[in-house]
């Protein structure tokens, strides 16, 4: 393994999720083990300090715009995500590790392209990437309930 590309994070909740077991444990497992989601793009990101200085209401507005793009791709079945928080957990001091998973590669790239036009990405990110994209080489069988 190359230490420069070793990334580590933890699942997290935003506070409005009705089922924390699903949000924090079961949904990420379902997504990474779903054989229909054969294409992936993984990348780290670090927010700029400018975002942290915004009022909470402004942060929410910016994140709703950004999240709306992801929800549109997700509700159409094109992109599903796994989001990991990695504040203080890895060498490069990133804030998040994002995994985009889908049945085809093009929508994953299209989603990243579209999100770059949001205020969150275009103004309030210090660092984005490197990107790791490809077809899943192997998946374990999903756990049985």
Regions of interest found by a model, annotated:
Residues 64, 87, 119, 129-136:
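Short, surface-exposed, charged/polar-biased interaction segments
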Residues 1-72, 103-106, 138-145:
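Short S/T/G/P-rich N-terminal loop/turn motif that feeds into the first structured element of a domain
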Residues 26-27, 74-85:
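Short amphipathic beta-strand starts and helix->beta connectors
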Residues 40-46, 85, 90-115:
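Short, well-ordered beta-strand segments in beta-rich or mixed alpha/beta enzyme
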Residues 1-18, 76-80, 103-132:
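An amphipathic, aromatic/His-enriched active-site/gating alpha helix that lines ligand/cofactor pockets
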Residues 50-55, 95, 110-112, 118, ...:
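Generic marker of "main functional regions" within proteins
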Residues 95, 101, 131-141:
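Short terminal or interdomain "cap/linker" segment that borders an active site or interface and mediates
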